[in-house]
């Protein structure tokens, strides 16, 4: 489908179920666990267009696939410590693919936040405290 989209010059068209930014309030289906943090970011997005994000386009998807293929091919060349923070309830990123990636790294460390959605940095206070502690401990 990405090839067809390229031939038809759909580079900037949104993928199915993806759209440009709207100011629709939808905490329940967001990638955020903390309503307070969601509300804060929501207000920032409404008030300032620089905070706004759009859905994925065919161009974005092609670039992501290209980057993923490159990383898979060159994973053994990564010689630095890598911390992978994995959201247990992520619906945007494949935890299986992340597991395969981190397992191939000689200095790979994985931390899982089982109750978190994609935006771990917008999780509940307990998860966020562990998340930041894990990051600081990793670099200590």
Residue positions per predicted region:
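Alpha/beta-hydrolase-fold enzymes
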Residues: 1-52
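Glycine-/small-residue-rich active-site loops that bind phosphorylated ligands and cofactors
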Residues: 52, 90, 127
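Active-site nucleophile elbow and catalytic-triad environment of alpha/beta-hydrolase enzymes
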Residues: 52-74
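Short beta-strand/loop motif that positions the catalytic acidic residue
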Residues: 78, 84-86, 90
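Short alpha-helix in the alpha/beta-hydrolase fold that links the catalytic acid
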Residues: 80, 94-103
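Short glycine/threonine-rich loop-to-helix capping motif typified by GTGT followed
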Residues: 93-94, 125
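Catalytic active-site module of serine/aspartate enzymes centered on a nucleophile-bearing elbow/loop
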Residues: 108-140
